[in-house]
UniProtKB/Swiss-Prot annotation:
Biased composition regions of type Basic residues, renumbered to the chain: 1-16
Protein name: Large ribosomal subunit protein bL32
Region Disordered, annotated ranges: 1-38
HAMAP family on file: Ribosomal_bL32
This protein's record includes keyword Glycoprotein: no
Family statement drawn from the similarity comment of this UniProt entry: Belongs to the bacterial ribosomal protein bL32 family.
Keywords, ordered alphabetically: Ribonucleoprotein, Ribosomal protein
GO molecular-function term, one example from the UniProt record: structural constituent of ribosome
Native organism: Colwellia psychrerythraea (strain 34H / ATCC BAA-681) (Vibrio psychroerythus)
UniProt key word Ribonucleoprotein: yes
Length: 56
């Protein structure tokens, strides 16, 4: 099993963890139905960029 040569400081630990934060999802409002959805994803009723792309 690998063992570190020396203890990592709180600063190094924090710098490593700086990329672990969870960011909130970006939401958009569909121009046709006014429904809120995730960016670059179709809405629950099958619209994407105001065009019906899938029959639901």
């Amino acid at each position: 099993m690998a063992v570190q040569k020396s203890k990592k400081s709180r600063s190094r630990r924090g710098m490593r963890r700086s990329h672990d934060a969870v960011t909130p999802e970006n939401l958009s409002v569909d121009p046709v139905s006014g429904e809120t959805h995730r960016r670059h994803h179709i809405t629950a009723d099958g619209f994407y960029k105001g065009v019906k792309v899938i029959a639901v």
